[in-house]
C-alpha cells in the first residue's frame, strides 16, 4: 500500500529521539507510537516489552542498542482543522559504546527531539550526542522528561542547557506541579493550561484545556514576555510589530520559533512525563510546528564519482534523479539483508536497478518497506524526503550511495572510529565453527565499528570493536540469533614490531638435496627502517642486475619476506615499517623454484631481523576528556599515571577540554575510573592516533607475557 502523505514533503518529518542513557527516550518513543495510533498496547522498557527495543538483549538490559526506524502519523489540530503529518522516527542508543549508531542516524535526519532527565538535566552522554548533532547541523527541540521524578526541577534543567551545552533555550511551556504533583503544562503561546486527570485506562490520551492556575499566572507572564522578546528578534517585521503593539499572534510566534529552530539559533523547551502519560501530545505538535520538513533543509550536495572536483546538488523532489544514502544494515530472519536508506531525491520502485556509486556496482531493488520497529509495511515506491528499507541488495554496506545509473552521484559517506579493543573468540564445538563464520560475517556487515580477522599463526578468530559492552552483545547475539556457542578471551591490544637499524648485505642460501629434484635459492638483501610516522608501511625493491635471479622468482622473495614479517621478531607481533631490497643472488637451472626463493626470502629476513634493533610498537590513542574544572587536577594526574602526555588544555562551555595521547593498553577500564573520579560528570572520546615505541620496561613485560613466562 502506498502511504497517503508521501507526495507533500511539507507534511513529512524525519526525526531522531536522542538522549543520555536512562533519560527515558525509548519510553517517550513508545508514547509517541501509542498516541499516533501505531500501538494498541503501551510497552514499558522496565517490563522488557518496548516496541522499539525489539532485540532480545535490548529488552533484557533496558537499553537501546540498534537504531530502530518507524513511521507514524499525527493529526495536528490547528484552529478549526486537522492536518495530517507523517513522522519517521529513529530511536538512537545513549550508551558510549554505540556512538556509531547515533552518528549514522543523525547523518540522515532533518531534526531531533533531545530528551533530558528532569532531575539530572544535561548529563555527559547528552553532551556527546548534542555535539554529534551539532556536527551534522541537526535542529532540535528539547523535552524535559521525568517531571514526576523525586527531585525533578524544570528550571535547573533549562539552566543546564545554557551552561553545559552553550545553547539558547526557548521556554515554550512551564510545568504545573512537580514530582508526584506533576499534573500538566502551561502553553506560553496560547496562555492555556493542559491538565491530565489520570483517568483509569485512558493512558493520557485525553487532557483538559483550562485557564492557567492562579499561582502560576505571574511566572507564565514573565516567561511569555521573555519568549516574545526572543521571537521578535528573529525577524525584522515581527520586531517592528512587537515594538508597536506589544503583542504577536499565535501563528506569528510559532513562525518565529520555527525560524529560530531551523537556523539552530535557539531550541524550544517542553516538559512532561512520558511514563506517566503527560505532555507527549503537545511535544508531537512541537515536532511538526518547529522541526524542518525535507524541503526546509538544504539540497544534498555530492560529487561526480568519476571526478571529485565536480560538485552536484540534488533537490528533495521526485523530478531530480534518484539518490539515497545507506545508513544502516540489519539481518531479518525471513527477508535476509535489510538495507535502511534515506532517499534525498527522485524515486525508485521495486524491481528497478540502481547504481551503488561507492562500489561501482549495479543492484536490483527487491521489495521496499517502511518499518515499524521490526514490522514491515510494503510500499510501491520510495520517494524523495523519506526513510525506507530495501530488500534484495547484495553487496551494499553502510555509508554507500545509491543513485540513478544515468546520473551518478557520490554523497559524503559516514566516518566511523577504528575499533580499540580486541578479543579472541573460539567455537565450543566443530559444528559451531561454520555457523560462527556466517554469524560474524553478518554481524560485521551490520556494524561498521565491529571487525573480524583471523590470526594467521594461532588460527584464532579475533573480533574488535568500540568497547566491551559492544563485544558482549555481539557474542550474545551469536548465541541467540545464530545458535553459536563460543568461548571468549580477555581484551587485547594490537601491538606491532619494527626495526630501528639497517642490516646490509644479508645473505641466505636455501639448499636441499634429498634424491630426485633438489631445492636451491640464494639471495643477498638489505633491510632498512622506513621513515614512516605511523609504522604501517612496507616497501620491496628489486635491484638485481645481470639476470642473476630470473624475474619470475622476485615476487616469491617478496612473499617470503612478508610472511616472515607477519610472525614477528621479539614477541610474535606483525612487523611494519621495513624497506626490503634484494640486490643479488643465484639461480640453479634445475633445482630453483618459486617455493625455494620464498623460503630464502623468509629466512633472510629472520636472520637479519635480530641484528636490526627490533622494538615493539603500541597503539597510541588521541584522547579528549571534557571535565568540570574542579576535577581537572585529578583527571590530569590520572592521565600522567597512564603514561599519557597532555597535548593541550582549552575552555569549552562550562567545561575544561584536555587533549592527550595515551597508550591503548593503559585505557582499559578508563571509563569506570573517570566516572568515579568525576562523579560521572566528565566524558571522553578516543580514537587511534599513531604507533609509538614501547618503553623498555614495558616491552620486557610484553615479551614475557607472550612467551608465557
Curated annotation (Swiss-Prot):
GO molecular function terms attached to this record: GTP binding; GTPase activity; translation elongation factor activity
TM region positions: none
Summary of the function given for this chain in its UniProt record: Catalyzes the GTP-dependent ribosomal translocation step during translation elongation. During this step, the ribosome changes from the pre-translocational (PRE) to the post-translocational (POST) state as the newly formed A-site-bound peptidyl-tRNA and P-site-bound deacylated tRNA move to the P and E sites, respectively. Catalyzes the coordinated movement of the two tRNA molecules, the mRNA and conformational changes in the ribosome.
Signal sequence segment: none
Subcellular location: Cytoplasm
Coiled coil spans: none
Positions annotated to bind GTP: 19-26, 91-95, 145-148
InterPro entries hit by this protein: EFG_II (IPR041095), EFG_III (IPR009022), EFG_III/V (IPR035647), EFG_IV (IPR047872), EFG_V (IPR035649), EFG_V-like (IPR000640), EFTu-like_2 (IPR004161), G_TR_CS (IPR031157)
GO biological process: ribosome disassembly
All residue ranges annotated as the tr-type G domain in the record: 10-295
Gene Ontology CC annotations of this record: cytoplasm
Any Pfam family the entry gives: EFG_C
Identification of the protein by name: Elongation factor G
Record-linked NCBIfam families: EF-G, PRK12740.1-5, small_GTP
Keywords: Cytoplasm, Elongation factor, GTP-binding, Nucleotide-binding, Protein biosynthesis
Main location group: cytoplasm
SMART domains: EFG_C (SM00838), EFG_IV (SM00889)
Protein family membership: Belongs to the TRAFAC class translation factor GTPase superfamily. Classic translation factor GTPase family. EF-G/EF-2 subfamily.
